[in-house]
């Protein structure tokens, strides 16, 4: 690990902005920091009422490398430039190697093994461990990985291919041939450390006469001399939902006090609480949610940085459902979703007739249904009269399946067939798409391109394998539609690193979530990872890094609140993280805020009526001996309403 200050001079943020005006290139560890710095740069010109200016050259380090490779492809040295594999081309190659070697060492999850192998390959190259790894005492799993890695290296070498893990080394080795960047000043912004691979390229830039510096949102001196007037403290709440609710009310209160304030919400466990945050923040920011326009164009004042799997978006789910219909039977409830979907031709004009048709189909259909059975049922109940466009959609799918769907082919051919199937159905529908839906369609098209190109190292595959791979890409691709700049940013731990706020709330800082847990790669010996000081390998390294982040949070805003729930979702007791014991416990005073439901309840006069007796048994029932005995008591103890239905209502 290369220390942040060990090799390159550190400059102030003001100097970074000045050099950006002069055409410097700034690289960051992640996209969030690049966006933050770009916005800060743009604000200088907007406040000066400048109408146009050159875009700041700020981008993540990985994008910087890809740009160099892309420029080299269009230079007179293109003949020496290897093909850069995408993440999914890489993943599929690893998976095919693992599957082919699976006869002697069976694995249950090839895709997960491929993902871990890809991560191990990246770590070994980023941290210059490949040579040490090959001479290190290896476990059985590590030996399997070494065998896969040798095959992977041979295949990519023979096909003149390279991956993201080796791109930085390739640029450094071929620097004189391919480095076409015109900038003479390069700045690493917000890096806690440089990997040996990154440091080697930066030294190459420095040796070539280019100015290389590092910078941070606040310099070390500024952090050390931070004023003691900042409001800091930690708070505890009963549950996670209660914690999120108070964070939402606090955010709304601070926003009402100063609409220009930048408010940060950080959650170490953002993946697990994302849906709860979305729901609770929306209910607090928009208590009258029933009045929000149905087209989804309303602007909410918060943004959650963590995207959702692309497959979870309704538009993509509908597309994958359509393709699934081509192959096999599906549950009828999924077929019902297809019928109600607005993303096909007739989705709006036949909306009501399709709902009535679906109700009739439910009376006749089996729990699972095929495309042919669905067409037959619709014709049986004369659905072509009320929903001709829907029947046309199904007929188009049948025709395409029977005439153009290959049993086995390459990914590019299947991508073309998938696209045609959706086009025949009028995807993405009749109505005008809102911004989120439009961006989702654009992302769908990009993963189709990714899917089509991912089979360069693969032989022909079946329809089932092709569709499974497309679904895997959609499930693993996290997508967050772009939105306008909003004042409340909800971030994960690493994304919030080095970001400055006016107000900051860090939630979930319990002993279960903080500090971060070590996460070593299973294919690399733990001892080798510890010797190299890879991040998050040992508990001590994870603790030290988490401690540094905690201190950074406390200096990143004028008001900082750390919170945790006293109980988890299973009712287990939680304690405050040991990293926040030194932070004083404070009461939190929020303005009185009532939800829309509470306001409605207060505006009404509620009536109560005691109704605790069931109706009397009829005379006809009493003429016969009553049955039940102890079963009545047993059923009532288990579920009163179920007992009433069973024994009184028969």
Segment roles from a protein language model:
Residues 1-650:
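Polyanion-engaging groove/track-forming segments
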């Amino acid at each position: 690990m290369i220390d942040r200050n060990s090799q390159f001079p550190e400059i102030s943020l003001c100097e970074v902005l000045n050099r950006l005006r002069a055409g410097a290139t700034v690289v960051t560890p992640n996209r969030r920091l690049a966006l933050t710095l770009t916005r800060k740069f743009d604000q200088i010109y907007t406040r000066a009422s400048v109408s146009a200016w050159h875009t700041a050259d700020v981008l993540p380090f990985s994008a910087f490398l890809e740009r160099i490779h892309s420029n080299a492809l269009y230079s007179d040295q293109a003949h020496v430039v290897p093909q850069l594999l995408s993440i999914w081309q890489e993943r599929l190659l690893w998976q095919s190697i693992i599957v082919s070697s699976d006869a002697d060492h069976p694995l249950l999850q090839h895709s997960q093994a491929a993902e871990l192998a890809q991560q191990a390959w990246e770590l070994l190259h980023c941290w210059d461990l490949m040579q040490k790894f090959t001479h290190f005492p290896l476990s059985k799993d590590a030996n399997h990985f070494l065998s896969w890695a040798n095959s992977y290296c041979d295949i990519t070498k023979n096909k003149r291919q390279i991956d993201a893990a080796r791109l930085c080394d390739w640029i450094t080795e071929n620097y004189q041939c391919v480095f076409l960047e015109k900038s003479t000043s390069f700045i690493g912004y917000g890096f806690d450390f440089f990997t040996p691979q990154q440091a080697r390229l930066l030294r190459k830039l420095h040796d070539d006469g280019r100015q290389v510096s590092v910078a941070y949102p606040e310099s070390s001196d500024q952090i050390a001399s931070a004023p003691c007037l900042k409001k800091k403290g930690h708070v505890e709440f009963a549950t996670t939902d209660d914690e999120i609710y108070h964070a939402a009310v606090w955010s709304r209160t601070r926003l009402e006090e100063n609409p220009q304030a930048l408010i940060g919400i950080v959650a170490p466990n953002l993946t697990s609480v994302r849906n709860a945050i979305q729901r609770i923040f929306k209910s607090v920011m928009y208590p009258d949610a029933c009045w929000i326009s149905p087209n989804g164009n309303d602007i909410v004042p918060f943004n959650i940085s963590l995207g959702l799997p692309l497959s979870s978006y309704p538009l993509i789910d509908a597309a994958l459902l359509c393709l699934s219909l081509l192959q096999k039977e599906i549950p009828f409830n999924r077929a019902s979703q297809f019928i109600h979907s607005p993303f096909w031709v007739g989705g709006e004009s036949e909306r009501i007739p399709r709902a009535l048709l679906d109700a009739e189909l439910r009376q006749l259909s089996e729990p699972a249904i095929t495309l042919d059975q669905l067409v037959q049922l619709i014709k049986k109940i004369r659905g072509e009269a009320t929903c001709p466009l829907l029947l046309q959609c199904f007929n188009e799918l049948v025709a395409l399946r029977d005439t153009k769907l290959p049993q086995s082919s390459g990914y590019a051919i299947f991508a073309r067939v998938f696209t045609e199937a959706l086009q025949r159905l009028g995807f993405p529908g009749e109505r005008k798409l809102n911004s989120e839906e439009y961006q989702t369609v654009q992302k769908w098209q990009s993963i189709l391109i990714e899917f089509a190109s991912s089979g360069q190292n693969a032989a022909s595959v079946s329809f089932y394998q092709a569709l499974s791979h497309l679904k895997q890409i959609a499930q693993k691709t996290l997508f967050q539609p772009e939105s306008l700049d909003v004042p409340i940013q909800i971030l994960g731990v690493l994304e919030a690193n080095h970001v400055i706020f006016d107000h900051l709330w860090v939630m979930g800082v319990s002993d279960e979530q903080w500090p971060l847990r070590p996460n070593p790669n299973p294919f690399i010996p733990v001892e080798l990872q510890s010797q190299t000081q890879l991040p998050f390998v040992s508990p001590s390294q994870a603790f030290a890094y988490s401690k540094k982040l905690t201190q950074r949070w406390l200096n990143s805003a004028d008001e900082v609140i750390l919170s945790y729930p006293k109980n988890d979702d299973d009712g287990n007791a939680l304690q405050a993280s040991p990293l926040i014991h030194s932070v004083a416990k404070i009461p939190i005073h929020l303005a009185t805020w009532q939800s829309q439901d509470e306001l409605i309840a207060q505006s009404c006069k509620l009536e109560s009526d005691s109704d605790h007796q069931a109706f009397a048994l009829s005379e006809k029932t009493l003429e016969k001996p009553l049955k039940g005995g102890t079963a009545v008591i047993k059923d009532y103890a288990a579920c009163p309403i179920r007992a009433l239905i069973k024994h009184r209502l028969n």
